């Protein structure tokens, strides 16, 4: 029986906001059922709000205190690419350093995590996160109090933000290929949709039940292939 560890952020915890804007974890992806279905052990160490820096620290701690898994999923990038709106609104962040984690630092963190796992004898599977429903996300920011004037100084277009989120995924792909890691991308299932917004919660970042069902399908294909079912 193979053992899988998951390291990531709120996406892998099935997090969704309720009507009062309280965020709750869920088993919307269905990892519990997949353990029995595909005869494997799955431990979820994903933590909401974590950037790659926090994931790396957490992974280091977990790997030093738990049995080494056969495979560890590494899912991050969404929080890294997100703008540091708190610092921006306080005038403490210039345009060049708008991301919570700069691309070059993100790349280094991701390389470090892969190397740590490989040194321990675990295979790393890079998990490319879902895209962001940018227009919904920007509307959410405006409703949360970010001024349109401040936003316009940092966001030139929806396409700009789409390209930046894709860039972090491209970094993961490049690092993964350089280090011989398998890649599981969740992006394509969403990008193929006619109306992607219908699969997201109202913040534009977290999928809704329908969106998490798409993610569940991608994982079912992955585990079925790993188990030799397909």
Language model feature labels by segment:
Residues 44-51, 99-102:
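Short secondary-structure transition/capping motifs
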Residues 60-209, 213-230:
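Alpha-helical cap/lid subdomain in secreted, periplasmic
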Residues 1-47, 60-68, 72:
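Serine-esterase "nucleophile elbow" of acetyl-processing enzymes
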Residues 1-3, 31-37, 56, 115, ...:
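Secondary-structure boundary/capping motif
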Residues 11, 49-51, 190:
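Residue-level detector of flexible, active-site-proximal loop/helix-junction positions
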Residues 12-14, 18, 53, 81, ...:
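Short, electropositive, low-hydrophobicity segments enriched in small/polar residues
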Residues 49-59:
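Structural motif
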Residues 22-24, 51-53, 161-163, 185:
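A short linear-motif detector with a strong N-terminal bias
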């Amino acid at each position: 029986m193979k053992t899988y560890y998951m390291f990531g952020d709120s996406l892998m915890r099935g997090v969704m906001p309720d009507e009062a804007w309280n965020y709750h974890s869920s088993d919307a992806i269905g990892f519990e059922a997949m353990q029995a279905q595909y005869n494997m052990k799955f431990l979820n160490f994903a933590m909401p709000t974590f950037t790659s820096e926090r994931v790396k620290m957490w992974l280091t701690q977990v790997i030093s205190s738990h049995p080494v898994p056969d495979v560890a999923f590494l899912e991050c990038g969404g929080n890294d690419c997100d703008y540091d709106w708190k610092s921006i609104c306080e005038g403490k962040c210039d345009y060049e350093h708008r991301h919570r984690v700069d691309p070059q630092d993100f790349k280094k963190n991701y390389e470090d995590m892969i190397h740590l796992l490989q040194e321990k004898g675990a295979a790393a599977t890079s998990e490319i996160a879902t895209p962001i429903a940018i227009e919904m996300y920007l509307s959410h920011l405006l409703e949360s109090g970010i001024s349109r004037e401040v936003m316009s100084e940092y966001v030139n277009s929806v396409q700009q933000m789409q390209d930046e989120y894709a860039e972090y995924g491209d970094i993961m792909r490049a690092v993964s290929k350089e280090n011989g890691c398998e890649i599981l991308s969740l992006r394509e299932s969403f990008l193929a949709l006619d109306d992607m917004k219908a699969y997201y919660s109202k913040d534009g970042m977290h999928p809704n039940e329908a969106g998490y069902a798409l993610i569940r399908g991608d994982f079912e294909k992955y585990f079925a292939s790993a188990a030799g079912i397909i």
